[in-house]
C-alpha cells in the first residue's frame, strides 16, 4: 500500500526522484500515465494489469468509454528507475501535469500520484475545506 506525501524537484533533464518508501512497492519498472485532476498516476505492473483489464471491459460502442480509454492509454509509458532512484518523465506527461520543478509525490493506496506543488496545494486546500462534506457524501459507498 502506498501512503504519504513527499516533495521532490524535477531536474533540468526531466528526472524525478521516486521516494525510497515507494520504490519497493513499484518495482524497477512501472507505468506512469495521465491521471485525473491534472496529476500523473503511477502503477506497479500488477496494478496496471488490473486497471487494463477493467478498462478493456468497457463497451467500445460508447463514445465516453472510448474517449477515456484513449486518453488514459495514450499517455501511458513504462518508466525504469535508475541507480540514483530517479525516473525520466516524458515531456508530454510533464506538460499535462504542469510539472516544472517542484513536485509532490503522493501515495494513494494502490497507486502513486505525481503533482506539481502548485496544483497539489490548490487541490489540497479545496479538499480540506470540504472534507466533512466529502465524508458525508461517500459514507453510503462504504
UniProtKB/Swiss-Prot annotation:
One of its GO terms (molecular function) is DNA-binding transcription factor activity. The keyword Cytoplasm applies. It is found in: Cytoplasm, Nucleoid. Residues 5-47, 76-119 form the SpoVT-AbrB domain. Keywords: Cytoplasm, DNA-binding, Repeat, Transcription, Transcription regulation. It holds the Pfam family MraZ. Signal peptide: none annotated. It comes from the Bacteria. One of its GO terms (cellular component) is cytoplasm. InterPro entries: MraZ, MraZ_C, MraZ_dom, MraZ_N, MraZ_sf, SpoVT-AbrB_dom, SpoVT-AbrB_sf. One of its GO terms (biological process) is negative regulation of DNA-templated transcription initiation. Belongs to the MraZ family. NCBIfam families: division/cell wall cluster transcriptional repressor MraZ (TIGR00242). Forms oligomers. This is Transcriptional regulator MraZ. It comes from Desulforamulus reducens (strain ATCC BAA-1160 / DSM 100696 / MI-1). The gene is mraZ.
Amino acid at each position: 500500500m502506498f501512503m504519504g506525501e513527499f516533495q521532490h524537484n524535477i531536474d533540468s533533464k526531466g528526472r524525478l526522484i521516486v521516494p525510497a518508501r515507494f520504490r519497493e512497492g513499484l518495482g524497477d519498472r512501472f507505468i506512469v500515465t495521465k491521471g485525473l485532476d491534472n496529476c500523473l498516476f503511477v502503477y506497479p505492473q500488477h496494478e496496471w494489469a488490473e486497471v487494463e483489464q477493467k478498462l478493456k471491459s468497457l463497451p467500445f460502442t460508447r463514445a465516453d468509454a472510448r474517449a477515456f480509454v484513449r486518453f488514459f492509454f495514450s499517455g501511458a509509458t513504462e518508466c525504469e528507475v535508475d541507480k540514483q532512484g530517479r525516473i525520466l518523465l516524458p515531456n508530454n506527461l510533464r506538460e499535462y501535469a504542469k510539472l516544472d520543478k517542484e513536485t509532490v509525490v503522493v501515495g494513494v493506496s494502490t497507486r502513486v500520484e505525481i503533482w506539481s506543488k502548485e496544483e497539489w496545494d490548490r487541490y489540497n486546500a479545496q479538499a480540506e475545506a470540504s472534507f466533512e462534506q466529502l465524508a458525508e457524501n461517500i459514507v453510503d459507498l462504504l
